[in-house]
C-alpha cells in the first residue's frame, strides 16, 4: 500500500513512469511500481500514452484502495476492440454517397489510383473507395478514442488497412511516416534529453523560482513560470515529473515549519494550488512552440501536406502571447480567487530552494555546452526567416534560403553526439543509450495521423465531407472558431489530445473547404484547444501525476479545471480571430 499523503516526505517523491510496454497484460497490483519512492531517478523521456494509461490505473488504486483496479478501463478497451470493426461495417453499409459528387477530371484518375483495382475511372468506383475509406477511418478513430490497443499500434493500422482494402498503394500511406515535422519533433526530443541528462532543466527551474519571490503567491508563480518555460522545449510529462518533487518539498516545509500564523487550511490550499499550477503550466507552456506538444507539430505537418507552411518563429510569435495570457489568468484564478493565498513572505521557503540550488554546485562544462546548443538552436529557429529575407545577407550566404526548422533541429541533435562533455575522457553530450529513450510511439502517432489525412484526401472522402458544409460559409467566422475550440477542449478531457487532433484535422480541413473558409480558422483552434484539458486526472499525464501526489481531491480539480476550460474556450477564439492573421499564413481572411 502506498504511504498516506501525510507521511509522504518530499525527498521520497520521485516518479518513474514506465513505458507502456510494461503496462500491457500486467497484474493490477503491479501497477504500484509506477509510483516509485525513495529517491529513485526519473526516466529521461516518458511516453504520454503509456503514462496516461498507467497513471489511470495507479490513481484508481488510490481511489479504490486496491480493489477492482483498472476494471473500468479494461472493459472500455475490450468493448473498443469489438466496436471498431463493428462501427466500420455499419458505416460501410449505411454510408451511401451520391455518385454525382465524384466526377473525375480527365487525366486525373491514373494519378489518384490507389491500387490496380482502382484503375476504373467510373464515379461508382470512386464512391466505393470513399465508402471503404470512411469505414476504415471510423475503425481507426474508435480504437484511438477507446485505446483498444496502445495508441502507437493503432497508428500502424493505416499501413495495413488502406492498402489491404485496395484504397491506396502502400507507398502512399508509408511516405507520411517520414514527414519532415516528425523529424523536427525528433530533434527537439533529443535536445530535451540532453538537457535532462546533465540536469540543466533542474537548474533552470530552481533559478526561475528563486528569482520570483518567496510569498505563497510568488512561489506558485515561480513554479508555474519555470514549468511553462521548460515545457516549451521538453515533454510536458517529463517537466511535471521533474518539478513535482521540488514542489512537494516545499509543501512539506509548510507542514513542518511555517512563518505564517494561518491554519492547516492555508497549508492545504497552498498544496492544492501549487500542484494544480504545475500541471496546468506544463500544458499551457507546450502550446507556445511547435516542439512543445505533439498536436502543434502534427498541425504543422498536416498543413505542410497541403502546401501551407508554418515556421517555428511564426507559430511562436502567435502562440506565445496566448500562452502567457492564459498562464497569468490561471495563476490569478488559483492564488486570488479559488484558493486566495496570502501575500506574506515565507523566508524558510527561500532557504529550501537555495539549498536545492547549492546541491547542484557550479555549472559543469556539459551544462554550458548543452545550454549553448539549446540557445543557438532556439535563436536559429526564431531568426531563420528574417535572415533569409534579408537580401544582402542571403546573397552572400545561400545556405539561409535552403535550410528550414527541421534541418536546424537535426543539426542540433547530431551535434550533441559529436561534442564531448570532457575533452580528455568524458562521454559525448548525448549517446544512443540515452537517445533511445525517445517516445517512439508519439512519432508513430504523427505518421498515423498524417497518413489517415492523406488517404482521406486521396479517396475524395475529405471532398465529400466538405461538400456537406457548403452553407457554413454564411455563419460568422468567430462563432465557428469558438465552436471548434469548445468542442475540442471538452472532448480531450476523455481522449488523448494527439489522437483527437489526428482524427479531427482532415475532417475540419474538409469542412473549411466546403464552407469556403481558410482551413487555418478551424485547424489552429483545434490544435490549441487540444492542450487545454484541465478538469480530469486522466485528461493529461501532468494532471494524473499531480493528482497522484495525494494533495488534490477530485472535486477541486474538476471545479478549478472547469473555470480554466471556460477561460481557454474564450481566449483561444479571441486570439485566433484577432491575432492569427498577423502571424500565420492565412490565404483568405473570411473576416469582416
Would you name each region that the model predicts?
Residues 36, 139, 146, 152-265, ...:
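Membrane-embedded alpha-helical segments and adjacent helix-loop junctions characteristic
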Residues 39-41, 46-104, 111, 186, ...:
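Juxtamembrane and boundary regions of transmembrane helices in multi-pass small-molecule transporters
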Residues 72-77, 105-107, 119-130, 171-180, ...:
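Interfacial loop-to-helix junctions that mark the boundaries of transmembrane helices
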Residues 82, 133-137, 152-156, 220-225, ...:
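Hydrophobic alpha-helical transmembrane segments
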Residues 86, 90, 137-141, 160, ...:
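Generic alpha-helical transmembrane segments of integral inner-membrane proteins
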Residues 99, 139-156, 173, 237, ...:
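Flexible hinge motifs at transmembrane-helix junctions and intramembrane kinks/re-entrant loops
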Residues 141-149, 226-235, 279-290, 417-418, ...:
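Transmembrane alpha-helix interface/packing and boundary motifs in multi-pass membrane proteins
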Residues 180-190, 232-243, 316-331, 401-411, ...:
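Alpha-helical transmembrane segments
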Amino acid at each position: 500500500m502506498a504511504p498516506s499523503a501525510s507521511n509522504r516526505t518530499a525527498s521520497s517523491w520521485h516518479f518513474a513512469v514506465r513505458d507502456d510496454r510494461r503496462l500491457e497484460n500486467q497484474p493490477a497490483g503491479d501497477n504500484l511500481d509506477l509510483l516509485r519512492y525513495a529517491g529513485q531517478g526519473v526516466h529521461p523521456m516518458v511516453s504520454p500514452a503509456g503514462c496516461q494509461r498507467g497513471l489511470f490505473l495507479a490513481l484508481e488504486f488510490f481511489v479504490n484502495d486496491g480493489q477492482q483496479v483498472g476494471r473500468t478501463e479494461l472493459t472500455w478497451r475490450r468493448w473498443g476492440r469489438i466496436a471498431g470493426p463493428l462501427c466500420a461495417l455499419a458505416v460501410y453499409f449505411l454510408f451511401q454517397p451520391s455518385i454525382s459528387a465524384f466526377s473525375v477530371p480527365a487525366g486525373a484518375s491514373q494519378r489518384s489510383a490507389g491500387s490496380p483495382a482502382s484503375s476504373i475511372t467510373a464515379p461508382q468506383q470512386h464512391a466505393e473507395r470513399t465508402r471503404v475509406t470512411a469505414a476504415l477511418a471510423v475503425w481507426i478513430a474508435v480504437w484511438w478514442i477507446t485505446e483498444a490497443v496502445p495508441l502507437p499500434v493503432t497508428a500502424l493500422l493505416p499501413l495495413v488497412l488502406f492498402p489491404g482494402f485496395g484504397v491506396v498503394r502502400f507507398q502512399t500511406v508509408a511516405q507520411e511516416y517520414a514527414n519532415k515535422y516528425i523529424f523536427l519533433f525528433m530533434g527537439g526530443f533529443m535536445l530535451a534529453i540532453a538537457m535532462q541528462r546533465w540536469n540543466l532543466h533542474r537548474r533552470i527551474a530552481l533559478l526561475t523560482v528563486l528569482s520570483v519571490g518567496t510569498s505563497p503567491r510568488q512561489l506558485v508563480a515561480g513554479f508555474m513560470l519555470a514549468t511553462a518555460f521548460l515545457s516549451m522545449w521538453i515533454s510536458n510529462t517529463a517537466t511535471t515529473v521533474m518539478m513535482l518533487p521540488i514542489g512537494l518539498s516545499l509543501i512539506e516545509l509548510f507542514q513542518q515549519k511555517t512563518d505564517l500564523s494561518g491554519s492547516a487550511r492555508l497549508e492545504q490550499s497552498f498544496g492544492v494550488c501549487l500542484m494544480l499550477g504545475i500541471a496546468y503550466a506544463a500544458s499551457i507552456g507546450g502550446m507556445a512552440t511547435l516542439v512543445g506538444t505533439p498536436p502543434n507539430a502534427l498541425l504543422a505537418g498536416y498543413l505542410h501536406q497541403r502546401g501551407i507552411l508554418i515556421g517555428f518563429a511564426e507559430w511562436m510569435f502567435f502562440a506565445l502571447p496566448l500562452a502567457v495570457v492564459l498562464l497569468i489568468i490561471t495563476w490569478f484564478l488559483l492564488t486570488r480567487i479559488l484558493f486566495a493565498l496570502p501575500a506574506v513572505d515565507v523566508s524558510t521557503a527561500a532557504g529550501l530552494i537555495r539549498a536545492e540550488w547549492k546541491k547542484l554546485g557550479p555549472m559543469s562544462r556539459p551544462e554550458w555546452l548543452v545550454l549553448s546548443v539549446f540557445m543557438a538552436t532556439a535563436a536559429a529557429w526564431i531568426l531563420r526567416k528574417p535572415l533569409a529575407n534579408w537580401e544582402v545577407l542571403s546573397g552572400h550566404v545561400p545556405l539561409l534560403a535552403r535550410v528550414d526548422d527541421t534541418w536546424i533541429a537535426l543539426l542540433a541533435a547530431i551535434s550533441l553526439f559529436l561534442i564531448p562533455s570532457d575533452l580528455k575522457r568524458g562521454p559525448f553530450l548525448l549517446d544512443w543509450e540515452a537517445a533511445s529513450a525517445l517516445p517512439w510511439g508519439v512519432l508513430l502517432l504523427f505518421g498515423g495521423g498524417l497518413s489517415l489525412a492523406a488517404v482521406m484526401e486521396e479517396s475524395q472522402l475529405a471532398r465529400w465531407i466538405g461538400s456537406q458544409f457548403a452553407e457554413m460559409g454564411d455563419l460568422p467566422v468567430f462563432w465557428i472558431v469558438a465552436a471548434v475550440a469548445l468542442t475540442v477542449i471538452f472532448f480531450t478531457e476523455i481522449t488523448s489530445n494527439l489522437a483527437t487532433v489526428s482524427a479531427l484535422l482532415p475532417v475540419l480541413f474538409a469542412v473549411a473547404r466546403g464552407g469556403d473558409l481558410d482551413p487555418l480558422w478551424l485547424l489552429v483552434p483545434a490544435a490549441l484547444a487540444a492542450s487545454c484539458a484541465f478538469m480530469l486526472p486522466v485528461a493529461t499525464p501532468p494532471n494524473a501525476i499531480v493528482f497522484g501526489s495525494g494533495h488534490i481531491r477530485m472535486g477541486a480539480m474538476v471545479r478549478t479545471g472547469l473555470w480554466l476550460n471556460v477561460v481557454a474556450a474564450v481566449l483561444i477564439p479571441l486570439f485566433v480571430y484577432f491575432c492569427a492573421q498577423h502571424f500565420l499564413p492565412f490565404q483568405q481572411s473570411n473576416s469582416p
